[in-house]
């Protein structure tokens, strides 16, 4: 996880928020099995004493994460992806035990000799944490340049994982150069 934890510190002149990257340990395993044009895969991870953001810093909780996914490629032109996920946070000091679960999906297609990819992808929390839907278009101009555009819609209550972004629906345009 590359996201910092924000910690409130008294530096003598008042409170100051600083970003910290606390260390953590993770154990996990994954599998994948292909069946012709489809793949079934799964992952499970255990993160003991994982850092969890709190009101004035971070605290620690054991975190279990699991994913079970299915990919289907139709003639190398159309792509379907569906995943079920779940996270269980056990007994943190501030928030207690929590459980999140849901599904992610992508439906896309390629055209113009695979240079253009269009589709829709998203995330739905069945535990009531909101939804994210993205409609996108990606175009590979050549081996170095790639352009993409899309729109993202967020839903959910203000106090939910995705709902806190509800007022942040946005349109994007990206141009990338790889060398």
List each model region and its residues:
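Structural signature of outer-membrane beta-barrel channels/translocons
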Residues: 32-36, 71-73, 108-112, 138-140, ...
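Membrane-embedded beta-strand positions in outer-membrane beta-barrel channels/transporters
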Residues: 26-28, 65-69, 104-106, 134, ...
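Repeated loop/turn-to-beta-strand initiation elements of outer-membrane beta-barrel proteins
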Residues: 37-41, 77-81, 113-118, 144-149
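Long, well-ordered mid-to-C-terminal structural blocks that present hydrophobic/aromatic surfaces
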Residues: 21-92
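Outer-membrane beta-barrel "beta-signal"
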Residues: 166-179
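Outer-membrane beta-barrel proteins
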Residues: 2-7, 40, 51-55, 89-94, ...
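Transmembrane beta-strands of outer-membrane beta-barrel pores
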Residues: 1, 35-37, 46-50, 84-90, ...
């Amino acid at each position: 996880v590359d996201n910092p934890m924000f910690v409130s510190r008294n530096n003598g002149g008042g409170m100051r928020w600083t970003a910290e990257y606390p260390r953590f340990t993770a154990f996990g395993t994954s599998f994948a099995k292909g069946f012709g044009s489809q793949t079934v895969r799964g992952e499970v991870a255990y993160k003991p004493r994982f850092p969890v953001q709190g009101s004035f810093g971070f605290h620690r909780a054991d975190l279990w994460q699991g994913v079970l996914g299915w990919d289907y490629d139709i003639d190398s032109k159309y792509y379907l992806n569906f995943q079920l996920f779940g996270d269980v946070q056990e007994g943190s000091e501030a928030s207690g035990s929590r459980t999140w679960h849901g599904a992610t999906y992508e439906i896309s297609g390629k055209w113009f000799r695979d240079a253009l990819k269009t589709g829709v992808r998203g995330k739905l929390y069945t535990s009531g944490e909101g939804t994210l839907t993205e409609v996108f278009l990606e175009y590979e101009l050549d081996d170095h340049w790639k352009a993409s555009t899309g729109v993202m819609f967020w839903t959910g209550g203000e106090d939910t994982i995705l709902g806190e972004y509800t007022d942040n629906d946005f349109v994007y345009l990206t141009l990338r150069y790889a060398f």
